[in-house]
Amino acid sequence: MELAPVRHNWTHSEVKAIFEMPFNDLLFKAASVHRANFNPNEVQISTLLSIKTGACPEDCKYCPQSGHYRTDLERERLIEVEKVVEQARLAKQKGATRFCMGAAWSDPKDRDMPYISQMVKEVKELGLETCMTLGMLNNEKAHELRNAGLDYYNHNLDTSPEYYEQIISTRTFQDRLDTIGNVRDAGMKVCSGGIVGMGEQAADRYGLLMQLANLDQQPESVPINMLVKVKGTPLENVDDLDHFEFIRTIATARIMMPHSYVRLSAGRNAMNEQMQSMCFFAGANSIFYGDKLLTTENPDADADMALIKKLGMNPETRHDYSDEAVAASLSSQVADKATSKLFYEA
């Protein structure tokens, strides 16, 4: 019997009941669902590169890349295709199977699309799964990216509809849903999640998950970020999120979206090994690997490989690798930790 069939009609009361289960019961249920759908001892390794940094016109209160706030961020133009491919090649050598490219835009402009499309094509030629996050997408640009071969498009809902206007005013919640719809219409996979710890209530955390799970097709990838407070942003002094609340969010996401990858994204630098291992037990099965995540710190690559080894886990391998030698080397990298830093990653 399937422990958690995919549903798209979750109610507020149902999700609340799951989120508020006794902690041990919640983790047991989430771990059971995870084991029924994934290898519990594999973790997907993704790398995220910032291809254009800062000066974003949006006013997301959590984001140091917003042009509305004074942070110490150095702005960078769209980087050259050749540099992106170089970093993707390094990522593959370090064990990544998925390469994500992010640009601090409200939406990509027509003049940038040829460069963006070329990045996708050349990264895919390396045998890597590709993902981009470029802001809002209309239907035409979504199809253009799909024609270039893009596998995933990331566009987070960020928080619940009820709390959304407390965080962002320059684009609506419906704008985000429309972009996800355009991505689906073009035939790409969806990566969509949110951020917790922005001063929201528990109802907003499970309300976000309800929105994601009730989409016509659930996201194939669900990144759950814990807020990284950055000086100069409006949320720099918000109260810390209780770590058990974060783990509850991971577990509830796993139960509600049993076939999705649940990714530990931003905020891992503030999580000790015990907390991260509990998240893996609760159903998280993907991480961003490397020393930086956009403009914020991420755990050291060596530390990640050491933790994966300590837990007896392995990096997930892709079956369609063009270079079998690289695929075969991933497990050995867990035993022989990477000895050099990755690179600037978004």
UniProtKB/Swiss-Prot annotation:
[4Fe-4S] cluster binds at residues 56, 60, 63. One of its GO terms (biological process) is biotin biosynthetic process. It catalyses: (4R,5S)-dethiobiotin + (sulfur carrier)-SH + 2 reduced [2Fe-2S]-[ferredoxin] + 2 S-adenosyl-L-methionine = (sulfur carrier)-H + biotin + 2 5'-deoxyadenosine + 2 L-methionine + 2 oxidized [2Fe-2S]-[ferredoxin]. Its EC number is 2.8.1.6. Keywords: 2Fe-2S, 4Fe-4S, Biotin biosynthesis, Iron, Iron-sulfur, Metal-binding, S-adenosyl-L-methionine, Transferase. The keyword 4Fe-4S applies. The keyword Iron-sulfur applies. InterPro entries: Aldolase_TIM, BATS_dom, Biotin_synth/BioAB, Biotin_synthase, Elp3/MiaA/NifB-like_rSAM, rSAM. Residues 41-265 form the Radical SAM core domain. Pfam families: BATS, Radical_SAM. Its cofactor is [4Fe-4S] cluster; [2Fe-2S] cluster. It is an enzyme of class 2 (transferase). HAMAP family: BioB (MF_01694). Catalyzes the conversion of dethiobiotin (DTB) to biotin by the insertion of a sulfur atom into dethiobiotin via a radical-based mechanism. Belongs to the radical SAM superfamily. Biotin synthase family. This is Biotin synthase. It comes from Pseudoalteromonas translucida (strain TAC 125). The lineage of its organism: Bacteria, Pseudomonadati, Pseudomonadota, Gammaproteobacteria, Alteromonadales.
